[in-house]
Amino acid sequence: MTHRFVAAGSIARYHSLYRKKLGAMLSMDIALPRNEQEWFEKLPPELNDKFEMKLYYGHLFCHVLHQNYILKKGVDEKRVKRELLNFYEDKGAEYPAEHNVGHEYHAKKPLSDFYKDLDPTNSFNHGIGRTSKLKHWRE
């Protein structure tokens, strides 16, 4: 467990030390399908060429990988993130794997429906999973 935190801290520190030479840093939690045998991605060259550095670390026996990417200077962070998420979706992976969707990711329909059942008035955590922020889930 400690190694995971050391790895995460080291890439973040590297990025902060060399931020003038580097692009943005992306951090992803990805749950691979249980039958996945290729744990380390093989990205298409046109996507792979956008990274200065990649670091992977994970959990034993559960197929959850934490993947940190440092982009090359000038690369569009939002576009690359979307390309990565599309790549993961095509592999059948789930994201985020460990820390729920928060306000950053779209909740898939079953999860969105679950939130609506738990909170019919949308009073407790409106906007979670990029759902409606309006009372009673109005759009």
Range-by-range predicted roles:
Residues 1-139:
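Conserved glycine-rich FAD pyrophosphate-binding loop
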